[in-house]
Amino acid sequence: MSVPTTDLCDDFADELRVMNPMFRDFGGRVRFHGPVTTVKLFEDNSAVREALSEPGEGRVLVVDGGGSMRCALLGDNLAALGQKNGWAGVVVYGCVRDSAELATIDLGVKALNVHPLKSVKKGIGERDVTVTFAGITIQAGDWLYADEDGIVVARNSLVQA
């Protein structure tokens, strides 16, 4: 991404929602942006796998995991799948695992923390629903921009491809 989130905030403050600063970088790509696809779940990453199995086409998967600190919702295998399928990044309101391996994968990954335990796989979760966490509300089709300084979300694309 050629335009930093700080510049987007300077130029488009009225059009942006800025996430509270609680996310850490884990992926091999720190700067990423794209249209949003959402999943909402709790301690079951089946919907994450389902989404990342599809062609990403430069999208960002926003995972509302309820902020759980009891298991990981993304690891190296799912991140590699997302990278292979053309996703720009994943933002997890929850934990990830395999952090050393995640750092080697060319995919943006931001999450609250790490946890070694994998999630359950019961197939429970919602797709393309409105989610609210980190002080903002996000809808499928919004545009997310992430870099070293934070995460901002807009209703429409703010940068030229």
UniProtKB/Swiss-Prot annotation:
Divalent metal cation. GO terms for biological process: regulation of RNA metabolic process. A divalent metal cation binds at D98. Pfam families: RraA-like. Keywords: Lyase, Metal-binding. It catalyses: 4-hydroxy-4-methyl-2-oxoglutarate = 2 pyruvate; oxaloacetate + H(+) = pyruvate + CO2. This is Putative 4-hydroxy-4-methyl-2-oxoglutarate aldolase. It comes from Alkalilimnicola ehrlichii (strain ATCC BAA-1101 / DSM 17681 / MLHE-1). The lineage of its organism: Bacteria, Pseudomonadati, Pseudomonadota, Gammaproteobacteria, Chromatiales.
